[in-house]
Design a protein with these regions (language model features):
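Long, low-complexity segments enriched in small/aliphatic residues
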Residues: 1-75
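Short, glycine-/Ser/Thr-/acidic-enriched flexible segments
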Residues: 34-36, 43-45, 61-65, 93-95, ...
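Local cysteine-cluster metal-coordination motifs and their immediate loop/turn environment
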Residues: 333-346, 367-384
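Cysteine/selenocysteine-centered motifs that mediate thiol-based redox chemistry or coordinate metal-sulfur cofactors
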Residues: 147-178, 312-345
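Long, contiguous, secondary-structure-rich segments that constitute the structural scaffold
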Residues: 1, 73-89, 93-256
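Immediate flanking context of iron-sulfur cluster ligation sites
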Residues: 323-334, 355-374
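C-terminal catalytic lobe of FAD-dependent flavoproteins
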Residues: 215-318
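Intrinsic disorder at enzyme termini
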Residues: 390-404
Length: 404
């Protein structure tokens, strides 16, 4: 049935053709007499309330496309298209009060451990609260703090206390403090690698994490890749430039140590850049990048590599520092639908040609791009974009529309 008709609503009793939209509408419950049982539970406060030393309430939760510790989902680059990297989310008022900016590295500390993450302002988080997805464990995050102690994934910060009845751990709340992480030297590595090499490289990079004040390694891309390649992202930060030998070790792991790599080194300033291109037909594609020290070029060179754009026009300008690209690069935009690799700009452009009510516009969008027609996880985002497009259409002149 799943192969023929797609996802089904649970529960689906044997012999039924469709799942039950709502349980217990007949008033019969799975007990001996068919009547519901209610448990009068006394209110219990959180095990670790906020205080002056730990003024933020950290909550954790799941991401749309990931599952628990990512032992399976964490191996698929396509599932990182929706949320590519770990962050800690704070209310914008708290970000301003702390004197921080989006993207700044911060240390989130509890009475049990510490984790370093980039900061992201979010209106969905209440003041005095912080949110970190529960999936970001030591498989992807690492580093060593200023006292030489290992950094942890998010569960190294959360609380091990369990509910006396269910024995479930209280992982959804912990008191934490958040402060800037003094790690000004940065490193970014990106590479397309054969699958087996990517697995070995990921483990080798994980072994290097303790040498930095912050490090992560994650896959990216879309399976199956036309050439059987897997994308790998490496990011690290430190209070001072890393030893050149360590930088060269990362270069070699990312396939940037051969004679086909373009390399720039400024040892005195701790600045290193390396790129590797591969000929494919009439084009030269970027297959590996390392930026160390000045990583501002990430804003455009990452798009070139991940979207596999022709890069031959850039030449040695690929080694240029700074956030301004030598040739304009248009990013594909945020991925919304993982199943069909549909991005937000694709959706916005298509909705500009749609007409009718919200349901009609959603149906036209799905017919044109197929987004939201498989697993359905992106439907809430799609409906939000439909509403936004309708609001925009109400205050602008009408555009060419698609038939209802």
């Amino acid at each position: 049935m799943l192969e023929r008709d797609g996802p089904q609503q649970w529960p689906l009793p044997e012999g039924a053709s469709t799942g039950a939209v709502r349980l217990y509408t007949d008033g019969v419950f799975p007990t001996d007499d068919g009547r519901a049982r209610f448990s009068a539970a006394d209110y219990r406060p959180v095990a670790e309330p906020r205080d002056a030393q730990y003024p933020f309430a950290l909550t954790t939760g799941r991401l749309r496309d990931q599952w628990h510790g990512m032992s399976r989902t964490g191996t698929l680059g396509r599932l990182f298209g929706h949320v590519a990297e770990p962050v800690v989310e704070l209310n914008p008022l708290d970000v301003e009060r702390l004197g921080l900016q989006d993207g700044a590295l911060v240390q989130v500390s509890s009475r049990r451990g510490r984790v370093v993450l980039p900061l992201q302002a979010s209106d969905t988080v209440a003041p005095a609260q912080a949110w970190i997805p529960m999936h970001w464990g030591e498989e992807v995050l690492g580093g060593t703090d200023a006292q030489g102690q290992p950094l942890h994934g998010v569960n190294g910060v959360t609380l091990p206390v369990v509910c006396p009845t269910s024995k479930q751990p209280e992982l959804k709340h912990a008191a934490v403090r958040i402060e800037p992480a003094a790690l000004p030297w940065r490193m970014l590595g990106l590479a397309w690698l054969p699958q087996e090499q990517a697995l070995r490289t990921r483990e080798a990079l994980r072994a290097l994490m303790p040498a930095f004040g912050y490090a992560l390694v994650l896959p990216f891309g879309r399976e199956p890749h036309a050439d059987g390649l897997v994308g790998l992202l490496w990011r690290a930060a430190a209070p001072a430039p890393a030893d050149e030998a360590l930088v060269r070790q990362v270069e070699a792991l990312l396939g940037l140590a051969g004679g086909d790599a373009l390399v720039y080194r400024d040892r005195r300033r701790g600045q290193y850049r390396a790129v590797r291109l591969q000929t494919q037909g009439a084009d030269r594609l970027l297959r590996g990048v390392l930026l160390a020290g000045d990583t501002q070029a990430e804003s455009w060179i990452r798009t070139l590599l991940q979207d596999e754009r022709p890069a031959q026009a850039y030449g040695r300008a690929l080694l240029a520092g700074g956030a301004t690209p030598p040739v304009a690069v248009a990013a594909r935009g945020k991925q919304i639908c993982t199943c069909f690799n549909v991005t937000e700009p694709d959706i916005v452009q298509t909705l500009a040609r749609c007409s009718g009510g919200a349901d009609a516009r959603l149906a036209q969008l799905q017919g044109a791009l197929k987004c939201g027609t498989n697993c359905g996880s992106c439907l809430p985002v799609l409906r939000g974009l439909v509403r936004t497009s309708m609001s925009a259409a109400a205050v602008t002149s009408p555009a060419a529309t698609m038939p209802s």
